[in-house]
């Protein structure tokens, strides 16, 4: 554990260019250059990378994989308190009233205007498409649409929490469908039903036919507790959850299509939440530069996986 911690600490201090590997290579054999024994790489780092990248086969380009692992080494893991909707709600709350419109169907867009189904045409000085890859390509024909990786997330409730605390539990042996799991109620109690523990688990790739039974059997082995009394609260399968980053992949794809037209999202960076946020910052900086707006943020921002 000490060697692993030291290796991750060194990685966290590594600047981006040396940390990034050749774009044409994959990370199928796991991260290299950390000086760790094979059992640590196979039992911990490979499952961790698979979790960070939603890529159980680790066909992701080495550069993208190294960037994702470095973000983890720098900031660890985090989730927004109150659920994934909390972050955009906080961003919207900082803007003037009536700035944000939701539930609007955009039918066409260009540098000077946005056409909507409900509100007609809206004028603009510049346009930023902050959407998934498919929606961006529909509005901007010519943008490349990548392949996608499917992900299934299951939420179980239990009378008592398994004794793992706030830890992320990885399947180092790849002995079942679950790639990683955590007792989410220990991390963020607001997500759990009152009086119950909430366990959130992720299946990468095609899920098994008998999903709940297979997952609960695997969770019993991972947590070392009986799961017969656990209740499946919800299961969400997304066949296009994460853009694939198979080699060669450029994790710093341009966000400026041309002056006045910008696009951001996990498909322009690493296919992670951190990558989506980073591409958004790159796009915002490009817009401020092109509009000659002073006062752009120049300090470092928190990073995590």
Residue ranges of model-derived segments:
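Conserved flavin/dinucleotide-binding core of flavoenzymes
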Residues: 189-305
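Generic structural signal for well-ordered, non-membrane alpha-helical segments
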Residues: 20-24, 37-45, 80-84, 88, ...
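Helical element adjacent to the flavin cofactor pocket in flavoenzyme catalytic cores
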Residues: 64-126
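Alpha-helical scaffold segments in soluble metabolic enzymes
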Residues: 47, 86, 90, 282, ...
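Mobile amphipathic helical/loop "lid" adjacent to a hydrophobic cofactor/ligand pocket
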Residues: 1-59, 70-74
């Amino acid at each position: 554990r000490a060697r692993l911690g030291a290796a991750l600490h060194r990685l966290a201090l590594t600047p981006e260019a040396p940390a990034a590997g050749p774009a044409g290579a994959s990370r199928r054999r796991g991260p290299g250059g950390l000086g760790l024994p094979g059992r640590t790489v196979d039992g911990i780092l490979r499952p961790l990378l698979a979790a960070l990248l939603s890529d159980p086969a680790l066909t992701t380009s080495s550069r993208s994989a190294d960037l994702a692992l470095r973000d983890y080494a720098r900031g660890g893991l985090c989730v927004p308190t109150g659920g994934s909707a909390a972050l955009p709600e906080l961003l919207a709350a900082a803007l003037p009233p009536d700035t944000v419109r939701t539930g609007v169907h955009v039918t066409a867009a260009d540098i000077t205007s946005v056409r909507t189904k409900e509100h007609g045409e809206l004028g603009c000085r510049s346009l930023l498409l902050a959407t998934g890859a498919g929606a961006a390509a529909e509005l901007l024909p010519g943008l490349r649409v990548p392949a996608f990786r499917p992900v299934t997330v299951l939420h179980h409730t239990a009378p008592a929490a398994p004794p793992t605390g706030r830890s992320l539990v990885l399947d180092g042996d790849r002995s079942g469908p679950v790639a990683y799991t955590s007792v989410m109620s220990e991390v963020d109690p607001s997500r759990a039903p009152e009086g119950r523990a909430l366990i959130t688990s992720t299946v990468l790739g095609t899920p098994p036919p008998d999903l709940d039974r297979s997952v609960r059997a695997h969770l019993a082995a991972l947590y070392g507790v009986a799961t017969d009394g656990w209740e499946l609260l919800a299961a969400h399968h997304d066949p296009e959850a994460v853009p694939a980053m198979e080699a060669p992949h450029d994790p710093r794809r341009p966000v400026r299509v041309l002056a006045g037209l910008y696009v951001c999202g996990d498909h322009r960076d690493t296919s992670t939440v951190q990558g989506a946020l980073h591409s958004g910052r790159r796009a915002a900086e490009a817009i401020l530069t092109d509009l000659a707006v002073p006062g752009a943020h120049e300090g470092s921002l928190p990073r995590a996986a």
